[in-house]
Every structure is written in structure tokens, then in C-alpha cells.
Amino acid sequence: MKLLTLNVHAWLEDNQAEKIAIVAQTIVEKGYDVIALQEVNQLISAPTISQALKEDNYGVMLLRQVNQLVERKYSLFWSNSHIGYDKYDEGIAFLTHLPVYEVDPFYCSQHQQPDSILSRKILGLTLEYQGQLVDCYSCHINLPNAQGENQLDNIRTIVERSQSSNLKILMGDFNTDAITDPQSYQNIKALGLFDSYEMAVQKDTGITVEKAIDGWRNHSEEKRLDYIFLNQAKRVLSSQVIFNGKNKPVVSDHFGLEVELIL
């Protein structure tokens, strides 16, 4: 199973159209089964194309480019989390070419109003892969020290969302640096999660942010903020950082993380 997670920093990047094209071409080349995206923005003022989606939605534009180039078409699932930079619907998304049985958007945070950046929507999908049902979650988590939120309670809400015995895969930006804050990282794993990076046979440094970014303004050092966690130990063939300037051009303030595993 081939997975990709990427915080796309949508419409906050220079040369955004070119960067969308790079991501689309990479999806076509790699043939990921499930792609989790965060900070998938659309202008609040943009014309609507459906009940939730605007015509400039990053996910919509990415999907259209991908599906022009593949035989096995992808579907987009998107949900709004909160208002970003006073002008965007900032959402989370999945692209997948697998059969989808259930779509489950929900807030993992105590804050649940769009006008609060602490409001954190999670998007859950129940997918079928090689005859097995898998629960996948696209996550953009509050910081460990977020005032008014308990990060571990937020993540526990995701882990306990479904009582099924399905494999659960939590993918995304967890705003926790395993390098400089190992205790917060260990606390997340103590919720019953396995880090695919640690289990991978082949891996690189795992660094997904290498400069100071929003939320990490005083932290210019290299960071591992993006993860693919599993609630069951599986054979992970590889964990590779992508869109980092070495493995594909940079397309966001975060690098992507691609993981291949055997179910």
C-alpha cells in the first residue's frame, strides 16, 4: 500500500500553479493509493462549485490535473476545519483511487468553531485495499502546548473514533518534533500508535521541515513534524521524505512523507 501525506500550505506559496503541477505529476508517477493533505485552502469569497467546495480549492485543482493523466481515476474528499489568514477556508483532504465505504469528518478538538485556529477537523475514510477495510485519517494536530487544548486528548479522540478492528492509519502534520521534543512524541505513541518511520526497512532522515514556519517561528532547526502512524505493527518497506529539493522539488513549507507498507 502506497501512502503520501503533505501539508500543502495552499495559496501561500510562490509559483503555486507550478507547484500543484509538480505534486500532480508525482502522484501520477508514483500511483499512491491514499494521499492525505493538510492546509487545503480555498478563498471564502471564491465562487462555489458544490455545497462545500469553491472553484479555487487546491484539492479540486490538483484532482483535475491528476485525473487528466491517469486511467484509474482518483476521488477527492475535503472538509473545512477553520478560517485561515482571515480569508481562506482551511481544510483537510484525501485523494484516493480505492473504493470508499465511509466518509467521517469530525472535530478532534474542544474548539469547534471555524473562527478559532484551535478548531481541528479530522477527515476519516474507510477504504478497501486488497479485500481489507482500512480506516485512514488526515490529521492537522494542535501543538503540544496549545493553550485551551490537550493535544493527547485530541489524538486519543481520533484513535478511539471507530471501535472496529480495522487497521487505523493516522497521516499528517502532528506539530510535534520527535527530535527536539522526544517526550511529546513518545506520549503520542503511548496512545497505542506505531510510527511507520521507525518500522521502515528503508528510510532517510525523516526531516519534513527545515526552517522556521508558522507555529514554529523561533525554531529554525530541522524538524520531524509529519508522520504516518499505525495502530497495528505492520511490515513497512520504506519511509521517504519527498518534495524536499532532493527527492522532487520543494512545493510547500513542509516536505511530504511517502510510505509503502504490506498489510
What are these model-predicted stretches?
Residues 1-34, 74-263:
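Active-site regions of metal-assisted phosphoester/phosphodiester hydrolases
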Residues 6, 38-41:
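Short loop/turn segments at strand-loop or loop-helix junctions that form parts
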Residues 16, 40-67, 84-89, 179-188:
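Metal-dependent catalytic neighborhoods of phosphoester/phosphodiester hydrolases
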